Amino acid sequence: MKLVVVGGVTGGASTAARMRRLDPAASIVVLERGEDVSYSNCCLPYYLGGVVEDSDDLILMTPQAFRVSHDIEVRTRSEVLSIDRAAKTVHVREASGREYDEPYDKLMLAPGAAPIMPRSIRGIDGPNVFSVRNVTDIRALKNFVDRPGVERVAVVGGGFIGLEVAENLRRAGKQVSILEGMAQVMAPLDEDMVQILHKELDDNGVALHLNSTVTAIEDGCVKAQCGGKEVSVAADAVVAAIGVAPETKLAADAGLALGETRGILVNANYQTSDPDIYAVGDAAEGYNALTHTPGRLALAGPAQRAARAAADHMCGLPHRNTGFIGSSCVRLFSQNVACTGLSEKAARKAGIPCDSVLVFPPDKVGLMPDSHYLAFKLVFEVPTGRILGAQAVGRGEADKRVDVIAAMITMHAGLEDLKELELCYSPVYGTAKDVVNQAALVALNVLYGRIRQVHVSEVRGLVESGAYIVDVREPGEYANGHVRGAHNVPLSQLRARMDEIPHDVPVYLHCRSSQRSYYALCCLQGRGWTNLYNISGSFLGISLYEYYNDKALGREPIVDRYNFN
């Protein structure tokens, strides 16, 4: 069998390597348009900040190494122009201009996705505008920003790549601005969780311009429309990290079907509408296992799994395609960020009845010197309790907790399963009742109606309407920051002061993280109160949720002082 692979990096290189392991006699040719066939594209931004010191280290395998190690022929700077499905050939043009036809028995399309560079933005083709797709791109960007006088960099787009580029440019001492078209960075996160990232960016000197539509890139600045007004952001260099679009022209020109998301349509075996042509990676349309709808996911893990499965199918081996759930993580200065499955907004958009809880437990035993809270949000289906997704932000191991949830989602687990999950424990690594266990317990209380809750996003409306809010923290904590108008009835004094809690209006309880207010709620409910609500996330969640928007919008805070500890 002869396999021709169009495109290298994750999908293409993985397909070729797997095929060689399965079939030592197969003829395998990889055709890569760029200069490098296998490189760590996820590590590209870290070259800007010096985490990766030598750009050559980004290159994982050379064509020579593929030949020696795997007997795979790799031809770089070779662009596939067309596919002749009837003749089973691809037409190739080399950098020299020479063109030829390459025959195949099986063809793998792994062209990836191209950075979105909107032509509506005047100056998008300027010499100081860069994208981050490959090693050549990142070398060019670093060479430019290292020039004398290049100090101000505007990053257009607040997704994974945009944030990683911004962080690393700040570490390199640059003045960095992010212009994002939506009301938040990191679209997969819910609004309550992403406010922590907005604060982190602001704390580290990154100027954040949300709801901004870039209109022009000029000498020394970026023009954008924000709230009906034009703003000008100083910039010596611009990084376009708006997003990516699947490279489907080759497939479409060959008459292969495209899917609803405009990715290459594939079946469960990653075959296109031509059974001898496969497609994987960023260009192919996938299947969301939670919403049961088509989707595209530009992540390395799913691309590698798809590449392996496609090679297996070519060789007659069975596999089980379960689709994707979307698990990812990123570091942003001191914060580790991870998410999996559906956010609350995504679940509601998909028509799935759901609820969520927000908890702030310590990531390890509090006596440990580096213990810190971990903001953890768990999304679940109502009334089944099926786990839909999770998000975590904190200085500790956010990815570890979210990986647990990813595994539970894959196994179709529910809150009761998560509650009983037995995990490793040592004071230096976690708590006896881990973050994920605690989140499940709180979620079960909500699911079964043992408690009622309101979310941090609702607190401003409650304060402005004069709602009765009770802060059960100790007086010293209350003095260090509290919700305006809140009544301080410490948990330690609650039993002696129950007569201060009204029965005839809704009462909203909070503490630092919702644990003590839950204890207070149970105490009062046991004595006959039926009008109680726990504020999910409590004062820590309120402070983190309100802070950045208060500062950016210049609005009146609903707290007399923020407290982030």
Where would I find each of the regions flagged by the language model?
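Rossmann-like dinucleotide-binding cores of NAD(P)H-dependent redox enzymes
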Residues: L58-I59, R152-A154, F160-A216, L299-A303, ...
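FAD-site-proximal beta/loop scaffold in flavoenzymes
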Residues: D125-P148, C221-K223, S232-A309, V404, ...
